[in-house]
């Protein structure tokens, strides 16, 4: 897991999927029960019957309570996600990421500056990923917590790496913050996911955890 919040995001998504599956199962079961009951009564009376349903306070309270409990469970998980999103983790070092048209600039350790551009197709080597290779990669240490500050200079960019569960907007005049942590060595790829101009699809992101 590389992004601190990715665990809680996956946990929340799994909870929603389980809840939706349970609700769908209950709805299908109730529909099947009603349909089979209507058919059974119709065959016994040899007519197509219509029923007059009356209100039931017990059923209203029951369904309201069950639905409220499910909603409360999802709300608590969402509150945990928001809490960890604003929690200040003790980080080993700081990395600044600035988006330009159409490349990324990384400021590492307060003094190292890396300009990351898309390499030309003529410079590709065997095994390189098209539109995902850049001339300089962001190299970070695994098992180390990093704090990333993200901003932009010209237009709105989006620092997105799907394998890490990361998608943060880089807005001129504003500094957004995320925390990265990798438990193993890996190389991850991403791109700018904001329509930032004619070369929007040519801003690759490569992070190598060593």
UniProtKB/Swiss-Prot annotation:
SUPFAM superfamilies documented for this protein: Cupredoxins
Gene3D superfamilies xrefs: 1.10.287.90, Cupredoxins - blue copper proteins (2.60.40.420)
A Gene Ontology cellular-component term: mitochondrial inner membrane
Catalysed reactions listed for this entry: 4 Fe(II)-[cytochrome c] + O2 + 8 H(+)(in) = 4 Fe(III)-[cytochrome c] + 2 H2O + 4 H(+)(out)
E.C. numbers: 7.1.1.9
This protein's UniProt keywords: Copper, Electron transport, Magnesium, Membrane, Metal-binding, Mitochondrion, Mitochondrion inner membrane, Respiratory chain, Translocase, Transmembrane, Transmembrane helix, Transport
Residue spans, topological domain Mitochondrial matrix: 43-60
Protein name, per record: Cytochrome c oxidase subunit 2
């Amino acid at each position: 897991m590389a992004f601190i919040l990715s665990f809680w995001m996956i946990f929340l998504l799994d909870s929603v999927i389980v809840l939706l599956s349970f609700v769908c199962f209950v709805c299908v079961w109730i529909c099947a029960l009603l349909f089979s009951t209507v058919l059974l009564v119709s065959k016994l009376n040899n007519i197509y019957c219509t029923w007059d349903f009356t209100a039931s306070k017990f059923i209203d309270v029951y369904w309201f309570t069950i639905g409220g409990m499910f909603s409360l469970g999802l709300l608590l998980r969402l509150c945990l996600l928001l809490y960890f999103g604003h929690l200040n983790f003790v980080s080993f070092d700081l990395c600044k990421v600035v988006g330009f048209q159409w490349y990324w600039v990384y400021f590492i350790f307060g003094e190292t500056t890396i300009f990351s551009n898309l390499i030309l197709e003529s410079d590709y080597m065997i095994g390189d990923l098209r539109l995902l290779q850049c001339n300089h990669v962001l190299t970070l240490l695994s098992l180390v917590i990093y704090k990333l500050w993200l901003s932009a200079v010209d237009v709105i960019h989006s620092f997105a790496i799907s394998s890490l569960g990361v998608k943060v907007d880089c807005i001129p005049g504003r500094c957004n913050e995320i925390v990265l942590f990798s438990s193993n060595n890996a190389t991850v790829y991403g791109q700018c996911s904001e329509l930032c101009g004619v070369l929007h699809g040519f801003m690759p992101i490569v992070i190598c955890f060593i």
